[in-house]
Amino acid sequence: MACIKSAQRAAQTALAPDAPYLAAGTMTGAVDLSFSNSANIEIFRLDFQSDSPDLPLLASAPSPDRFNRLSWSRPGAVEGDSFALGLLAGGLSDGSVAVWNPLSMIRSGSASLAPLRT
C-alpha cells in the first residue's frame, strides 16, 4: 500500500477529534535510530494539500517520561475557549498522567507551561 503522508517516529498517537491534527508521544520501550532516550510530545498538521511526504510539525515539547497511551479529548463547551482543541492526556511509563493544552502548544510552538501531573 502506498504511503500518503508520514512522520518517522516510534510513537503513541492520537487524532484531534474536530481538527486536522495528530499528536505523537515517544513510545515506551522503543529505540529510535539515534538511540536517544529522550521523551517528547509533538503535534503535526494533517496537510494533504502539499506535495511533501512529511507531515508538518507544529509544536514539540519535552515530556517527563515516555508514553504508554495518548488520548486527545473533545473541545470545551465554551466558544473561544482556551481549550478549544481539547486536552492531550498521556499515560506515562512511570505510572503518572501528564496533561497538555494543544492549543497553547500550537500557538507557542512548544509547551509554554509544564504538563499537569497526577
Where are the model-predicted features located?
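WD40 beta-propeller repeat fold
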Residues: 1-118
